[in-house]
Amino acid sequence: ANTKGIIRTLLGRKCRFDLWEPTQWGVHKALPLNQAKVEYGDAIKRAGTYKALNRLIQGSAADQTKKAMVDVYEQTGIVPHIQVHDELDCSVKDEKQAKEIQQIMETCVELEVPSKVDIDLGESWGQ
């Protein structure tokens, strides 16, 4: 992020760090490169690169959840009712169908450390 101004999530989505700030400690507005050079001189650095690791983790988790949603639909025809963070809520006929969705979600992205998915079944979302 510091040198190229970009990181990529697990599935290749770009997260850009295009703004610049002075290297001196203090409260300064992050600006595009040309404006930052005019405002702060040559002693500038990329702004916000301390957020790169979090963007990588959160962005990759979002990629995985989105891919799981698409794979569940393509492989089962089931459309999730709602997605919250890393959770998909679906209506299923039986536990077998729920376990199929679980398997799809666990394998939608190949990882060295596997993802584990919990399933909860109930007559309604309140159970």
Name these PLM-found stretches.
Residues A1-Q127:
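Conserved catalytic core of nucleotide polymerization and phosphodiester-bond processing enzymes
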